């Protein structure tokens, strides 16, 4: 007798999840190991909980989304994080992306304009024992200058251009990954590397993200 979706063996479910991520281009061993350790199901609540292991974005609170796992993996892979790196994430959301980054970097700072999301993510980080993440309610479009410079910056919301304040907070040799383009159209995921003089830009793939909005939310 075949088990139903609710009775799926956790090991088989994880194997299927990782296979889907690998089949979409996530090949870095450290990233795959991080995605194996961090259970996406812990970050998806309510009526969408049974879809946590599908490769698709899902709604969360405050009108935001948790990105599809393959995109989380590809963005993490593009950052080429070293174990001693200090990373800034713009857009905490559910906290899933920051949790993945925490397995790759020495220290992760993540900011979001929605206080509720920061509060819920912080509680979840504590529950999961992820002690190298600091989540803050802040206007992410201005970065986190008091902790700059950063080895890596990940922006999980779309900007019309790579934000100048974030570029300025990258170390020389640092990498930023950011979706660029209009929010009502397909955007391009851009990898920016800071050089001794100027920046190098590389287009990675088309994506769809919520917009990067200035200011602090009221929720």
From Swiss-Prot:
Enzyme class, UniProt record, top EC level: transferase
GO CC annotations on file: cytoplasm
PROSITE patterns: PCMT
E.C. designation(s): 2.1.1.77
Keyword rRNA-binding: no
Organism for this UniProt entry: Cereibacter sphaeroides (strain ATCC 17025 / ATH 2.4.3) (Rhodobacter sphaeroides)
Gene Ontology biological process terms from the UniProt entry: methylation; protein modification process; protein repair
Location of the active site: 67
Any coiled-coil regions, as ranges: none
Full protein name: Protein-L-isoaspartate O-methyltransferase
């Amino acid at each position: 007798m075949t088990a139903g979706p609710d009775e799926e063996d956790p090991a088989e479910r994880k194997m299927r999840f990782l296979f889907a991520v690998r089949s979409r281009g996530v090949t870095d061993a450290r990233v795959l190991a991080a995605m194996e350790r961090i259970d996406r199901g812990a970050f998806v609540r309510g009526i969408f909980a049974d879809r946590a292991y599908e490769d698709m974005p899902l709604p969360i609170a405050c009108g935001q989304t948790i990105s599809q796992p393959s995109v989380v993996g590809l963005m993490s892979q593009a950052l080429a994080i070293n174990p001693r790196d200090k990373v800034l994430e713009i857009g905490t959301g559910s906290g899933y992306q920051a949790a993945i980054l925490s397995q790759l970097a020495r220290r992760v700072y993540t900011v979001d304009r929605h206080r509720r999301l920061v509060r819920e993510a912080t509680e979840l980080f504590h529950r999961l024992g992820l002690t190298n993440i600091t989540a803050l309610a802040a206007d992410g479009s201005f970065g986190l200058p008091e902790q700059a410079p950063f080895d890596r910056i990940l922006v999980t919301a779309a900007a019309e251009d790579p934000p100048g304040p974030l570029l300025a907070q990258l170390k020389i040799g640092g990498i930023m990954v950011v979706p660029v383009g209009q929010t009502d159209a397909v955007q391009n995921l851009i990898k920016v590397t800071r050089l001794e003089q100027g920046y190098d830009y590389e287009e990675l793939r088309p994506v769809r993200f919520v917009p990067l909005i200035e200011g602090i939310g009221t929720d």
